[in-house]
Amino acid sequence: YAIFKKALYIVMECMTMMLASDGEGASKMLECTVSGAPDQDTAIIVAKSIIRSPLTKCAMFGEDANWGRILCAIGYAEADFDIDKVDVDLESEKGIVEVCRNGSGIPFSEEKASEVLSEDDIYINVNLNQGEAPAKAWGCDLTYDYVKINGDYRS
């Protein structure tokens, strides 16, 4: 049973990622990993809030390491935590760029950030630094094509 359960989880996670990357007009697959949450519910709420944020989706499409948009999404998550302890990194196959420490932006190379965010698979890593609970959520960017597809759609 344990082996089947683990295999099923892997298959379901892969299917979730495939669905997320197949969004209308999508150009990037986004994976948000939250760690250090005080509890599982908080980790899930924060990860989903980030991945659902239109501003975060637009920033990733624009290859803009706008950590403020990510913190904004974290801030409007209905969860109890201290925003002044939050760290944010952006990652892809081209590397990692640290953009926020202790709830504030830190100096980083815009060139490196653009290089990291030019990839099709982007990882948004958030550490709340307030516990041990983790969560992941998947989504896609918000592109011009998404607006065109949905703006032209008639029911």
Name the predicted role of every residue range.
Residues 1-62:
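A glycine- and small/hydrophobic-rich beta-loop-beta segment
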Residues 36, 44-48, 52-155:
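Internal helix-turn-beta structural module
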